[in-house]
Structure formats: structure tokens, C-alpha cells
UniProtKB/Swiss-Prot annotation:
One of its GO terms (biological process) is endoplasmic reticulum membrane fusion. It is a multi-pass membrane protein. SUPFAM superfamilies: P-loop containing nucleoside triphosphate hydrolases (SSF52540). It is found in: Endoplasmic reticulum membrane. One of its GO terms (molecular function) is GTPase activity. The chain crosses the membrane at residues 745-765, 769-789. Its main location: endoplasmic reticulum. GTP binds at G63, S64, Q65, S66, T67, G68, K69, S70. Residues 1-21, 840-862 are annotated as: Disordered. Belongs to the TRAFAC class dynamin-like GTPase superfamily. GB1/RHD3 GTPase family. RHD3 subfamily. Cooperates with the reticulon proteins and tubule-shaping DP1 family proteins to generate and maintain the structure of the tubular endoplasmic reticulum network. Has GTPase activity, which is required for its function in ER organization. Residues 766-768 are lumenal. This is Protein sey1.
């Protein structure tokens, strides 16, 4: 039968099937050599006790050797412990064996029975070391200690195992009195065998109680417990069984009745000294349980036995704490496996995105993290809360710290990514909304756009942060991160507002430049309006369009800048810009407007431009009379006088244009007053792109006079020289035109003409037709000469004659091509080899009446 039990050396490294076979009838917990079986936990798992938690009970049986302890357990619990052969009187149970109750129908669940090696055996003789150690082990682990004695041994010291019970009492004082907060009680269940019935069970009970009380009073007790009673630490129960051999049927019946008592019960408060049973309902009271979870029983028992074997003082609370530490660590590692499976992929995904430089916002991270944490903590609580409360609380806190540190790092990185993504999305949303507003016509409220997008972005981040919140966990309150995010959005909003105001300033500056380009260009174009038709006299004061040009330029400039300031201020209000920001923007606008005006003026007075305007001004005065009619120069005209007056008048513009002066003050405009003082809100970045202005910026070193000087002295002199050369050319051209109209014919030619042509002259005068024809020709020639049409008429006549010749050539070519004889005589090629000649029309002739050259090339004249 022992072959069906797992001994200490069996089961290591065996398969589950072999373990099931080895554990069929139980396991040897301690062998005769005092070695502990580390396979106990496998046995508990195989019998499904390990998963029972606290729902199990442990019973140990004591008694003298060969008194039928194993037989009693086999009948009572259905176990199959080895029993002594009736033909041999030798030891059968060696060490401590354990088996699970097989008769579970009427008993409590998961009853574990330990069969302890009998005492007073001849095999060990005087060696009582194992006897004491096994008693200490059983008392430290068991709820109920069954003492198996025969009726005739009641009243005896050795026979009734009183020496063993004394050891039990001493061990109890050693173990449980150290832990005064938890006075663990034990039940001594006396099973009196071979009870004949002559002596009532109550009398036997009284005898045993008296003996036990006497033993209790004889043992030494700690200070303060000298007067303690045995009933303060032990409960007693009694049962009697008839003789197994002589009364087998009754023995079986009483054993079954005895088995019904191994259920949960409670204390009978109304019991008296004559009762043979002090417990009601069953022998398993809650205070008997050692409060060691079933899955930790093997480790706990091993620690207990190691302490016992090494003869160290056994401290059960310490052992329970050590067990709790071991099991809590083990459970923590187990529950973290599932936690790792859920969180590790997210950590890796986040790490990869961070390495790539694009932190990712993980979807459903809060839900996944909260569920993984809750599951991990709940599983730990379910399995570990059954152990020592102090250790459990500490280990749970350690587990929560460990998983919370991982979640915290993951969540913070997640919020950092959400933070960056939110800022980017906010900036892009504002930019897109501004672009949409500009495309819609430019009417958009920047402040409303920023506030709307900010509220939307904050709500998204808030939801993301709230999704990471774990109830009851302080660190998961990400309100500080929310406040930091809100603060950064405010900073981004301020930056975007500043950028938008900068863009607004750029748009206004462009508008100012555009308006200045038109207005200033118009004023400078008026410099050419010096002709008489405009009311400008040839002498005296300069026309109004010339002498007050700078007043009109400054007036137009002030008007444009004022309108620009109004536009800027109105738009800046829609940005909710502060007064300082508005003042800085206006200050920058005025400075840049003056620079734009100065650049436009410099463009107008560039050498090529100003020289052209001076020429136009001069030609208007020289080529046109007082009424604005073009002059036709004749030799009798005072060309020199007109030229001198027009030249001097135009040269008077050079000093006028060389300096920006107002006629009202005869001084430059007050740029210091125009620009204004530097506002308090100006930052260094606001001045980086500003051009220094002389007379305004003290550090520039230029004076207001230098700032308003348009043409330097060398430039003026060069301009005067170049203008005079140009004016001289115009004068020479006019003079040549006047002289070129006089034909130099010798006077004698007229006398010769009169003598030689007198007959013809008289004939014409006498012939009315010729006379009228002469009058018509003479009149037409005079009119054509007066209107300067002789040239065009001669050109038209030349073109007509040339066209006639071209048409004649074309007709001749057609004749030759169509006449076989002519073509043969001239050796012309066949007709199909000739190029097709296009017809002649007016649009194919040039100004001389000749055919224009085409891409096909001109035909050779015939």
C-alpha cells in the first residue's frame, strides 16, 4: 500500500500523470530522517486544495505506536495510510504522512489529515527528539489534534500520552504566547478506543481533564501568565469508539457518527462540566485556523520545519510574515505577467515613435492602462490578501508603486505627445482659419478664431488627460499638466497674435507703398507740365505744380499714413491686442512709411528718371507757345531767347528737388514729431528690421538735414551738365529745322528762267485751261507745304509707282509661265516646278511701295 504514497524522494521531475499516480493515497511530508518533502505543493495542486484559499482544514493525529491511529484515520476519512499487520508488532508509520479526506459527503471541504509517527516506539527507544519536533510541527500547522488512546490507558501517564501532551502544552506556550495579539487556540480531540461502556464517557472526560489540568499547572509559564488556565488556550472534545474486532458493526457506525462532527461549528455557551461535547455543530471553529492560505501552506510548513530541525526558537508570526513576503512576491510576479502583456507593447510603440522624433498619441491608452492596473491589483488582492495583513499591505503598496511608475512614465510621455500634437494642431487650425478668412474677403476676427481653437484644443487635451485618470490614485490627476498646456497655448496665442499683427503691419506697409507709388509718381509727373497751355508763364514765378511739390508730397504722405494707421488700429482691435502692442505697431508703421517715402523719392530722382522729367519740362516750355500750341520754327523766330528762358526755368527745378523743404516753414518736415517717441512695449526683435532715420535715431549719426537731402552736390552738378547737353541738342535740332526750310537758289537762275521760258509762260497765261490748272497745282502745293504734307504726298506717289511696277512684273511673269513658246525661248522650267507666287496687295508692301520680305524669300526680278 505504501507504493501508492509519494515519499520524500519521489515525484521530483516526474510528469503530471506519474504525480497523479504517486499522490493517489497521499504524500510523506516528513520522512524518518527529518527531511521535508518539497513536493507538498504539487500534491495540494493535484488534489485542488491549493486553490481553496482559507477553505481547508488540517488535522493531526497523535498516539502511541501501534494503537490504531492509521486505522482510525482510514475508516474515518477514507484514507489509505499504512497499518500494522495483526501478525507483527512493528512500526508502520514513519515520519509524518498527509492525505486528503475522501469522505467529503458529510464533512467539511478540503480536510487534510496528517498521520504522525507514533510515540513510545521501540525503534526510536529513548530518542524523543523526533517526537518533540513532530509535535511542534503538528501544533504549528494543525487546527485539531486528535489524541488516540485506549480506554484502559485513561488515568495512566505514559499510556495516556500525558508526556506527549505536556510537550504539546510547552510548545503551545513557546509558539503562541509570543503573539499576544492573536491568541490562536487549538482543539484537543480525544478519541477513546475500545470503549466497553462500563465507565461513562463523562467520567473518562473528567479524568482526562484533571490530568491535563495537573500537567498545565506543572509547566513553567511566562511572567504574567502564572495563573492562566488551560481552557484559555485549548478546547477539548471527546469521543468513544467500541472495539473494532469484537464489535465491528458498531465500530463502523460510531466512526460514521464521529465523522459527522468534522464540520464547521461554534462554541456552546450553555455547556456544563458534565457535557461530553463543548462544541455545537462541528469541531472546526474559525479561531482554530492558522490563517495560512492553502497555496502557501507548503512554503509555510517548510519554513516551520526548517526552524524546528535547526533547533531555533520557532516564531510563528515571523514565519507567517516570511511566508507572506515570499508568496506576495511570487503572486506579484505572476500578476505582473498579464500587466506586462498589456503595457509592454504600448511602451515599445511609444519608444519607437520617440526615437523617430514623432511622439505618438496612443489610442485608448487610459482605458487599457486602467483595466490592466485594476486587473493586476485585483488579482493580487484576491490571492495575497489571505496572508499576513501587514506584509500584504506593504507588498500591495510596492506592487502599486511598481506598476504606477510604469504607467506614470507611459502616461506622462503620452501627455507630452498630446501636448505637442495639441500645440501643433492649434497653430495649424488658427493658420487655416485665417487663410479661409482671407480667401473669403479678408473679413475675419482673429481673436475669435484664437479663442475658438484654444477652447477646442483645451477640451481635447482635457478629455485625453481625464481618460488617463485612475480613481483613488493621486498621481493620475494631471491638472498640473493641463495648466502647463493651457499656459503654453496662451504663449502660442500671444506669439500667433504677434505674428498676425506683424503680417497685418506688412500688409498695411504694402498698401502704403502702393498708395505712395501712385501719389508720389503723380506729383513728380507734374514736373513736365511746364507748357504754356497749363498757365505757366515763360518768366516770373514758377508754376504752382513745381514750387510746392514737397508740400503736396508731404500732404499726400500724411493722408496715406493716417488712413493706414486707422486701418491698422481697427484690425488690431479684432486681435485683442494690448495698447502697447498697438502703439508699437503704429510706431513701426510710421518709421517704415517714411522709409518707403524716401525710397520712392529716390526712385523718382534716379539719374535716368529725373533727367527725363527735366527734359520733358524743358521741351514743354521750349516746343510749345503760351497757348500750348506746338511751335513751327522759322528763321524769323527768337529761338535763342526761348531756349534760354526754358533752360533756366528747368534748371531752377534742380535745387528745388535737391532738398525736402516745406514752403510754409522753409524747413524739412518734423520727422521726430511724426515718428513719435519709442513706446514702452518695444522689444529688441521689433527693431531688428527697422532702417535708421537721421534726426530721429540718435545713434545713427545722421542729422535731419542729411536725412531730407535728396540730391547731393556732386549729383546736382552732374545732373546740370547732362541736362545742358541734352537741352543744347534740342536747341540745335530746332535751329537746323528753321534753317533747313530755306532753299539756296542763285538769283540769276530766276532771270535765265524768265528769258528762256517767256514764250511758254505767255502761252499758259493765254490758255484758260492751262492757267486754271496752274492755279490749282500752285494752290495745292502751297496748302501741302503749309501743312507739311509734301513729304507724305511724295512718299505716296513713290509707293504707287513702285506698286505699279510690281504688278507689271507679276503680269509679265504670268504670261511667260502660261505661254509655251516664250517659256521655251527663255529656257524657263516647267510650270509645276515654279513656286507659287502670292498676290500683291497693300498689306504686302512696305512704306516705299515694295513688297515686304517673307519667310519664303523674295523672287528675283525678271
Amino acid at each position: 500500500m505504501n507504493g501508492h504514497f509519494a515519499a520524500v524522494d519521489n515525484g521530483n521531475g516526474s510528469s503530471p500523470d506519474s504525480n497523479a499516480h504517486s499522490f493517489e493515497h497521499g504524500i510523506q511530508v516528513i520522512n524518518e530522517d527529518k527531511q521535508y518533502n518539497t513536493n507538498l505543493n504539487e500534491y495540494l495542486n493535484e488534489t485542488h486544495v491549493a486553490e481553496a484559499g482559507f477553505n481547508y482544514h488540517l488535522i493531526s493525529v497523535f498516539g502511541s505506536q501501534s494503537t490504531g491511529k492509521s486505522t482510525l484515520l482510514n475508516h474515518l476519512f477514507g484514507t489509505q495510510f499504512s497499518v500494522m499487520s495483526e501478525r507483527e508488532r512493528r512500526q508502520t508509520t514513519k515520519g509524518i504522512w498527509m492525505s486528503k479526506n475522501k469522505n467529503e459527503g458529510k464533512m467539511a471541504d478540503n480536510i487534510l489529515v496528517m498521520d504522525v509517527e507514533g510515540t513510545d516506539g521501540r525503534e526510536r527507544g529513548e530518542d524523543q527528539d523526533f517526537e518533540r519536533k513532530s509535535a511542534l510541527f503538528a501544533l504549528a500547522t494543525s487546527e485539531v489534534l486528535i489524541v488516540n488512546i485506549w480506554e484502559h490507558q485513561v488515568g495512566l501517564y505514559q499510556g495516556a500520552n500525558m508526556g506527549l501532551l505536556k510537550t504539546v502544552f510547552e510548545v503551545n506556550m513557546q509558539l503562541f504566547l509570543k503573539d499576544k495579539q492573536n491568541q490562536t487556540r487549538s482543539l484537543l480531540f480525544f478519541v477513546i478506543r475500545d470503549h466497553i461502556g462500563v465507565t461513562p464517557l463523562a467520567n473518562l472526560r473528567n479524568t482526562l481533564i484533571q490530568d491535563l489540568t495537573h500537567i498545565w499547572s506543572s509547566i513553567s509559564k511566562p511572567a504574567g501568565l502564572e495563573n492562566s488556565k488551560i481552557e484559555d488556550y485549548f478546547d477539548f472534545a471527546f469521543a468513544a469508539l467500541p472495539h473494532k474486532i469484537l464489535q465491528p458493526d458498531k465500530f463502523i457506525s460510531e466512526v460514521q457518527n464521529l465523522g459527522s462532527r468534522f464540520i464547521a461549528g461554534h462554541r456552546n455557551k450553555d455547556s456544563d462540566a458534565t457535557d461530553d461535547q463543548e462544541l455545537t455543530g462541528g469541531v472546526f471553529l474559525p479561531e482554530y485556523h492558522r490563517r495560512i492560505p492553502a497555496d502557501g501552506l507548503s512554503i509555510y510548513a517548510e519554513g516551520i520545519w526548517d526552524q524546528i530541525v535547526s533547533n531555533k526558537d520557532l516564531d510563528l508570526p515571523t514565519q507567517q510574515e516570511l511566508l507572506a513576503q515570499f508568496r506576495c512576491d511570487e503572486i506579484a510576479r505572476e500578476v505582473q505577467i498579464a500587466f506586462d502583456a498589456a503595457i509592454a507593447p504600448l511602451e515599445e510603440q511609444q519608444a519607437e515613435s520617440t526615437r523617430a522624433g514623432k511622439p505618438a498619441v496612443l489610442p485608448n491608452l487610459g482605458q487599457i492602462g486602467a483595466e490592466a492596473r485594476e486587473k493586476c491589483v485585483k488579482n493580487f488582492e484576491t490571492q495575497a490578501s489571505r496572508y499576513h495583513k501587514g506584509v500584504y499591505t506593504t507588498k500591495r503598496a510596492e506592487l502599486e508603486d511598481k506598476i504606477d511608475n510604469r504607467l506614470k512614465a507611459l502616461y506622462q510621455a503620452h501627455l507630452t505627445a498630446a501636448h505637442k500634437a495639441g500645440v501643433t494642431a492649434f497653430s495649424e487650425a488658427v493658420a487655416n482659419a485665417v487663410k479661409a478668412g482671407q480667401k473669403a474677403g479678408g473679413a475675419y476676427e482673429f481673436a475669435e478664431i484664437v479663442e475658438k481653437q484654444k477652447t477646442k484644443t483645451l477640451e481635447i487635451f482635457k478629455k485625453e488627460a481625464q481618460s488617463l485618470a485612475i480613481p483613488g490614485v493621486a498621481w493620475s490627476n494631471f491638472k498640473p499638466q493641463y495648466l502647463i498646456f493651457e499656459k503654453e497655448l496662451d504663449e502660442v496665442s500671444a506669439r500667433l497674435r504677434k505674428e498676425e499683427m506683424r503680417r497685418l503691419a506688412i500688409r498695411v506697409e504694402r498698401w502704403v507703398k502702393s498708395r505712395l507709388g501712385d501719389a508720389i509718381g503723380l506729383e513728380f509727373n507734374k514736373l513736365g507740365s511746364g507748357r504754356g497751355g497749363s498757365g505757366a508763364p515763360e518768366s516770373g514765378e514758377k508754376p504752382a505744380t513745381e514750387k510746392d511739390i514737397w508740400d503736396r508730397v508731404w500732404k499726400a504722405f500724411i493722408s496715406i499714413v493716417g488712413e493706414a494707421e486707422s486701418r491698422f488700429t481697427d484690425r488690431a482691435k479684432s486681435f485683442e491686442a494690448s495698447d502697447d502692442e498697438v502703439q508699437v505697431g503704429l510706431w513701426r508703421l510710421r518709421r517704415k512709411s517714411w522709409v518707403a517715402l524716401r525710397e520712392k523719392i529716390e526712385e523718382e530722382v534716379m539719374e535716368s528718371n529725373i533727367l527725363m522729367k527735366l527734359r520733358e519740362n524743358f521741351e514743354d516750355k521750349f516746343r510749345y507757345d503760351e497757348d500750348g500750341v506746338p511751335r513751327i520754327w522759322r528763321p524769323s523766330d527768337d529761338i535763342e531767347g526761348i531756349y534760354t528762358r526754358a533752360r533756366e526755368s528747368t534748371l531752377g527745378l534742380v535745387p528745388l528737388l535737391s532738398r525736402f523743404r516745406l514752403t510754409s516753414t522753409s524747413a524739412p518736415p518734423d520727422l521726430i514729431e511724426f515718428v513719435g517717441p519709442q513706446p514702452h512695449g518695444v522689444e529688441p526683435g521689433d527693431e531688428e528690421d527697422l532702417t535708421p532715420i537721421g534726426g530721429v535715431d540718435e545713434d545713427e549719426g545722421k542729422s535731419l538735414e542729411e536725412e531730407t537731402t535728396i540730391l547731393s552736390e556732386p549729383k546736382k552738378q552732374d545732373l546740370v551738365v547732362r541736362f545742358k547737353k541734352m537741352a543744347d541738342g534740342v536747341y540745335v535740332e530746332a535751329k537746323r529745322s528753321a534753317i533747313g526750310g530755306i532753299t539756296q537758289v542763285p538769283l540769276y537762275f530766276y532771270a535765265v528762267l524768265l528769258v528762256l521760258g517767256w514764250n511758254e509762260f505767255v502761252m499758259v497765261l493765254r490758255n484758260p485751261i492751262l492757267f486754271l490748272l496752274l492755279l490749282l497745282i500752285s494752290g495745292g502745293t502751297y496748302v501741302a507745304y503749309s501743312l507739311n504734307l509734301l513729304g507724305p504726298m511724295m512718299q505716296m506717289a513713290n509707293a504707287a509707282s513702285t506698286q505699279g511696277m510690281e504688278i507689271g512684273k507679276a503680269k509679265l511673269r504670268d504670261f511667260l509661265e502660261n505661254h509655251e513658246g516664250a517659256r521655251g525661248a527663255l529656257g524657263m522650267p516647267p510650270k509645276n516646278a515654279q513656286r507659287v507666287e502670292s498676290g500683291i496687295s497693300m498689306d504686302t508692301l512696305d512704306s516705299n511701295g515694295k513688297r515686304k520680305e517673307t519667310g519664303l524669300g523674295a523672287e528675283d526680278d525678271i
